[in-house]
Amino acid sequence: MKGFDPKFKDFPDYIISITKEIWEGREISSLHKYYDKDIIVRSPSSVVVGNQQVIDATISTLAEFPDRTLYGEDVIWCGDPEKGMLSSHRIHSTVTHTKKGIYGAPTGRKLNYRIIADCHAKNNKVDDEWLIRDQGAILKQLDLDPKEFARELISKEGGPENCVKPYTYENEIKGPYIGTGNDNDWGQLYSDILTRIMSADFSVIPKEYDRAVNLEYAGGISDISYKGADNFWMGLRSSFPSAEFKICHQIGRLDEKMPPRAAVRWILNGKHDGWGTFGEPTGASVFILGASHSEFGPHGLRREYCLFD
């Protein structure tokens, strides 16, 4: 890979290896080597600019969860070393809640949750990122109410006027990566499926999904088959019936020894104006940054992962 350290055999190896080196190897200072000093990191809760803030956040997380592991389940990617590459990295993380921190007093509980990180890299450095951590899964396992947790966090940060602002179109910062993925058929198929679902065509689920599809969804939800997919997507869409659904990025891949896969990053922007997963409509403005991965087999979409915060 031109411009990258020769110790990495390919781009997925680069992404998985530096993640392990930084977090499990405790080489947090290597972020200076692998992350651009002006990196932009967008997550549902904030937009962060600068590598020093990334380093500070990494130290804070490891202080609360010293035994954190990050298992790279998949890296779905596009691009080339000369122009830059974009990876969608799905991680299964395990931790033990042994130290006091953002989640309160230590409980000793062992937690499992997923992250999807879309990273743009060129010349051995990551310079643009979209990061989604399944906070709902963490809170559920700690018996914390997500709504109360969010309210308390806002209060600690000085109230609605002074707290860290969540990511929206208003505080978007244009970074080095302006691509929208690749034109692989599998990425296009998955984008079409999600677009049809968000256009209220839920009949696409039994048409395109394998009856035995395995489902891993935001909030630590594990489910199976058509009903599980229908419950999740119906509950989300019915909560925000008038919200605009936008595909921001799509990648499809067909690699040796791997099934066809796709990664899609999307935004749902509008009002909480319907009954669904989030209860009684409040009319609140809502901006959801989501990431979805899928795997296809002989009978259709057979594995689906979808995260938002």
Regions found by a protein language model. Give the residues of each.
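C-terminal and inter-domain tail/linker signature
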Residues: 1-309
